[in-house]
Design a protein with these regions (language model features):
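N-terminal beta-loop-helix "entrance" segment that forms/cooperates
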Residues: 36-55, 150-154
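Short internal beta-strands
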Residues: 31-38, 219-223, 356-359, 381-391
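Phosphate-binding loop of NTP-binding sites
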Residues: 25-31, 48, 61-68, 79-223, ...
C-alpha cells in the first residue's frame, strides 16, 4: 500500500509513546485515526481530545467502519500485542495491510533524510536534543521521538523539511526496518535478552543496523562500545565520548546549577555551550546530538542556541520540585546502566544531600538477568525503596521478585520494600531531602499525587 492511498489508520496498541507519535502524524494529515489500548492513560485521553477514536475493550465490533476497509486502511501494531489478540486476528484473517510501527518509520526514512539515534539508553534524550537543534535551525526537521519533548509538549514534530529525526528502537529488532541517512549509537549494553537470547545476538543486531546506513551518510558511535560496525562503502565513521574522540567536550564547568563546556569537533569547535537542562549525563548526549546536527549543516550559533534552549523530556530526569529544602524528580531509567547514570548524576548534583529512590523494576526477565547490576547501581544512593515488579507484557517467573535486588544492595544502604499502593502513604510519613522515582512502569502515574503530598508538607 502506497502512503498516498491510505485513508484510515488503525492502531492495535495505541497508547505507547512511540505509537502515539505516528498517530499524531496521520491525524495532522487529516486521516481517520482509531485504535485499541488496554487501559486509558493521560496520553490516550490526550489523543482522544486531538481526534483519535480509542476503545479499551478487545472487541473487533468496536473497530470503526472506515477502519474495516482493507483497500484504504493501514493497520499498525506494537510487538507487545499478543498474536492471538482478537482485533489483530480479524485484520490478519481479512487480508489487511499490517505493519509494525518500525516499518512505517522505515518508509519515512526512505522518503526523507533519516537522522536516527539507537542505543540501549540515551536514545530518547539524544534524539530529542537533536530534533530541537535541527527544528530551530535553518534546516528544520520532522521528528518521531520516544518521549514527550518539554519544548513542544509532544513526541513528534511535523514540517516540510527533508530531514526526519527518529528514535531507533532495538526491541524486537525493530530498527532493522530503518534506512538511516545518519545514525548515532549511544550504547549497546545487553537488554531484551528475552528476545535476543544472548549478548552476542544483541550486539550482532546493532552491527546489522549499521549496514543499513545509506551511502553518503555517517555513523556517529560512542568510542567505548564493544561492537564492530559494518558500513556500506561511502558511509563516514566518527566516534565521540565525554572527553575523547572525533567529537568530545573540553573545559567542562559545573557551577551553581549550570553546566558549560566547549564542543570539540573535526568541523568547527564551539566554545561555551550551555546546557538548558543542566545534568552531567546530558553533556555526552549533547555531544552526540550536536555532532549529527553539525554534520548536516547546523551553524555554531544554531548549535549553541539549541542546546541552551533545550528543555528536556518528560520522565527523563524530570524535576517536579526544586527548592533549597527539597528536590523531587522522576526518571524513566529501567536498565541497570541507566539507573547507574541517573544515580551518579544526582549524586554529583547533590553531594551533601540524603538521596532516596523509589524504584519499580520493569519486567521479570530484566530483573532476573540484571538484579545484581540493579543493586550495585542503586547502592550509590542513601536509601532505596522497592515496589513489586511491573510485568508489562510478561507472565511471572518463579523466584523472581524485587527481593533479589533488595538482598543484593550494599551494606549501609537503608532499604525497604512496599506495595505500589502504599507509596503515597510512605511519602506522607517520611521526610526527604532528595527523592527520585525510577522506572518505566506505572508508578509514574502516582508522581502528580506525590508532588501534591510533598508540596503540602
Amino acid at each position: 500500500m502506497n502512503i498516498e492511498d491510505i485513508k484510515a489508520v488503525y492502531f492495535v496498541g495505541a497508547g505507547g509513546i512511540g505509537m502515539s507519535a505516528i498517530a499524531r502524524y496521520f491525524l495532522k494529515k487529516g486521516l481517520v485515526v482509531a485504535g485499541y489500548d488496554k487501559t486509558p492513560s493521560d496520553l490516550t485521553r490526550q489523543l482522544e481530545k486531538e481526534g483519535m477514536l480509542i476503545h479499551y475493550e478487545e472487541n473487533k465490533e468496536l473497530i470503526p467502519f472506515a477502519c474495516k476497509q482493507k483497500t484504504s486502511c493501514l493497520v499498525i501494531y506494537t510487538p507487545a500485542i499478543p498474536a492471538e489478540h482478537q482485533e489483530l486476528k480479524f485484520f490478519r484473517e481479512n487480508g489487511f495491510e499490517i505493519q509494525k510501527r518500525a516499518q512505517v518509520l522505515g518508509t519515512l526514512t526512505q522518503a526523507h533524510k533519516g537522522l536516527c539515534v539507537a542505543g540501549t539508553h540515551g536514545k530518547t534524550t539524544t534524539s530529542t536534543m537533536c530534533a530541537h537543534i535541527m527544528h530551530q535551525s535553518h534546516l528544520d526537521c520532522n521528528a518521531f521521538l520516544g518521549g514527550i519533548s518539554k519544548n513542544y509538549g509532544t513526541n513528534y514534530i511535523l514540517s516540510d523539511s527533508d530531514y526526519v529525526v527518529i528514535e531507533a528502537d532495538e526491541f524486537d529488532r525493530s530498527f532493522h526496518w530503518l534506512r538511516p541517512w545518519m545514525s548515532v549509537i549511544t550504547s549497546t549494553d545487553p537488554d531484551h535478552l528475552d528476545i535476543y537470547g544472548t549478548k552476542e545476538a544483541y550486539l550482532e543486531s546493532f552491527r546489522h543496523y549499521t549496514e543499513l546506513i545509506q551511502p553518503g551518510g555517517a555513523l556517529i558511535i560512542h568510542r567505548d562500545l564493544e561492537m564492530k560496525e559494518h558500513l556500506q562503502e561511502g558511509v563516514s565513521r566518527y566516534d565521540y565520548s565525554l572527553t575523547e574522540g572525533d567529537f568530545h567536550a573540553e573545559n567542562i564547568r559545573i557551577d551553581s546549577g549550570e553546566i558549560t563546556f566547549d564542543f570539540i569537533s573535526p568541523i568547527e569547535n564551539v566554545k561555551d555551550v550551555q546546557l538548558g537542562q543542566p545534568i552531567p549525563i546530558n553533556i555526552e548526549n549533547g555531544i552526540a546530538a550536536m555532532a549529527m546536527a553539525q554534520l548536516n549543516g547546523c551553524t555554531a550559533e544554531e548549535l549553541k542556541y539549541g542546546m541552551q534552549t533545550y528543555g528536556g523530556v518528560d520522565r527523563r530526569f524530570d524535576f517536579k520540585i526544586k527548592t533549597d529544602k527539597l528536590v523531587f524528580l522522576s526518571d524513566y531509567a529501567h536498565h541497570p546502566k541507566e539507573i547507574y547514570q541517573s544515580a551518579k548524576s544526582i549524586r554529583e548534583l547533590y553531594k551533601n544531600k540524603h538521596i532516596t529512590a523509589i524504584f519499580q523494576p520493569h519486567l521479570y526477565t530484566r530483573t532476573r538477568d540484571f538484579y545484581k547490576d540493579f543493586a550495585e547501581a542503586l547502592s550509590q544512593l542513601d536509601e532505596v525503596v522497592l515496589t513489586e515488579i511491573y510485568p508489562a507484557r510478561e507472565e511471572p517467573i518463579e523466584g523472581v521478585t524485587s527481593q533479589l535486588i533488595y538482598d543484593n544492595l550494599k551494606p549501609g544502604v537503608k532499604k525497604e520494600m512496599i506495595q505500589k499502593e502504599d507509596v503515597i502513604n510512605y511519602v506522607k510519613t517520611h521526610q526527604f531531602e532528595v527523592l527520585i522515582v525510577l522506572g518505566a512502569g506505572d508508578l509514574d502515574n502516582q508522581v502528580p499525587q506525590i508532588s501534591k503530598v510533598l508540596n503540602s508538607k
